[in-house]
Amino acid sequence: MAMICAQAPLAFADQSQQENTGNVRHFHLHGSGTTNPSKLIWLAMDKLEEMAGSTLRMTYRSVGSGTGASDWASANAGDFASTDYGLAADSSAPFMQLPFQIGAVSLFHNVPGVGTGVMKLSACTVAKIFTGAITNWNDAAIAADSGLSLPSQTIKVIWRSNGSSSTYGLKGYMYAGCQAVYSTAPTPSDGADPFSGNHLYSTGVTGSDSMRLAIGANEYSIGYIDAGHGHLDNLSEVSLKNANNEWVVTKEGDPAGRLTANIPAVVTSTVKATFPQNSGATNYAGDWSGVNLFNKAGAGVWPICAFTYLHVRTTYTDTATTGVVRAFVEYMLSPAIQDKITEFYFYPLDSAFAAEVKTAVSTTLSAASPVWTWVDPYILSYNTGIAMGYTTFSPKRQTYAEYERGLFKKNIAALEASVAALKTELAAKTGNDDAADERTLALAAVSFVVAVIAVIVGSIAMCRGGRSSQVMRVVGM
């Protein structure tokens, strides 16, 4: 029993070996890599474990693209990896490189009174700022781009000190958009202090959270981060000029009259022609190290985009592992997960492209045995042997923890609606009705206390439900 419940070590571990004999069926899947999709991957793994007809244990180490790539290059280190950039092919151990989501890197600033989209910066102006050629917000180049008269304040340049896909994306944009200023081709391995120059003020931070906090805490600063997380903190986004000479932002609603970019539209037929090819078709087992989505042409295209990849072997020593890997990747490319990506501040693939990648996976991993089967929850008449089979995923299989999470989300939504209504009521009060104000404040206080209690109770119930479901699975075995 202890062997069943223990977590398998992942770093530099061999490929998983499945137990699939007689009535003993225990399946495993382990990977590591970039932090960006970690929450999405964990969600997908939770759902698959829940829906599986057999004991299924899946883990993902959120360690960064660099460590994930190093793990992957170390013989049979785990079953899959994930990075925010393509890797070189390995003829001795062939593997597929499978895009499954798109990230958009944005520039955010903290110039008081200048909101999202108001400030426009071309690639050359951005390059001059980050190389120290421009050090003051009242520089003529900034005024020419934006039409703004900004105060004479030192630009506080904030950059990632530990190497990141965001730095790679920004340098790729500057290189693709203005080689007259920035002529060094970027590489994913660019590490600490990636921008040299005569900055009057610059500082490095580690991680996306540190970046967003640093921008928010320092007036007259500028930095870069994946777009969704910047918007989460209501940071002011810079409007960038794309290859079609459009001033675009990633923020929804065309703020300041700027065009909201269509992120998935970056994958045009022209871009797909730059993918590795084999007999006129995309070679997902080819060399993807030269593929990028920087400053690509197209209407409404955002100029700093990047794929997030899943890397999986073309063959595994255990065909049952092939089956689990195939099922996991197919699920990541299915509408069930693609539709969730925006909740984690990234962007899904175009549905046709996602289907193409999914077909490539299914074809390449056709040696899977067993092949996991998906049961459609809306079919009233189905083969019971399939639905109750060991290697099936059925949405009808759920846990109490999942049920509690659903209630928890509904309660939070109701609370948010109540708070919004209270804000509207308070905003509408223009007189000196102290009694009404006191009633409203009292109601708000009661609502807040009830909400806190609901959150605490919901969290406890959710955790207890999760533990209970795990115990029930072990007992059931």
Model-flagged regions — what are they?
Residues 435-468:
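Single-pass membrane-anchoring alpha-helices
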Residues 18, 420, 449, 470-471:
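Serine/proline-rich low-complexity intrinsically disordered segments, especially terminal tails, linkers
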Residues 466-477:
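Intrinsically disordered cytoplasmic terminal tails of membrane proteins
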Residues 14-426, 432:
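Flexible loop/hinge segments at secondary-structure junctions
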Residues 4-8, 136, 454, 458-462:
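Hydrophobic membrane-targeting signal helices
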Residues 3-17:
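N-terminal signal peptide
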